[in-house]
Design a protein with these regions (language model features):
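Hydrophobic alpha-helical segments
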Residues: 1-118
Length: 118
């Protein structure tokens, strides 16, 4: 269940961080291993709401993108909205932790100018 959502979180967090290495790496996983089409990939890069996920997963994705872009903008209203979509606190935490870890990876790869090796 979580393979596509996790790869989508990594991809779209990397888009916000302008990490070309991770964008291309995660795009490759989505396209070559998880069945996402090139059209779906481009659509979700333009707007996370276009990701080929169910509503619960999409809500978590949009929340993570908001939080990694401006963590101070997250409020209890956001958390309650996720809970109303049947997201557990563990799922909310796990999704955001996944996104936050991706930010740190993006920073490292960008700072050290790591070139694509794939």
């Amino acid at each position: 269940m979580w393979y596509v959502p996790y790869s989508t979180i990594r991809l779209l967090v990397s888009v916000t961080q302008h990490c070309e290495y991770c964008i291309d790496f995660n795009a490759g996983i989505l396209l070559n291993q998880l069945g996402v089409t090139p059209e779906q990939l481009e659509a979700m890069k333009q707007n996370p709401e276009n990701a080929p996920l169910n509503e619960k997963e999409k809500s978590l994705l949009v929340f993570v993108i908001k939080a990694v872009s401006d963590s101070n903008s997250v409020s209890e209203v956001d958390i309650q909205a996720l809970r109303r979509k049947d997201c557990t606190d563990l799922e909310i935490f796990d999704a955001l932790a996944h996104g936050a870890r991706q930010v740190s990876g993006d920073i490292l790869l960008n700072a050290f100018k790591v070139e694509k090796d794939f």
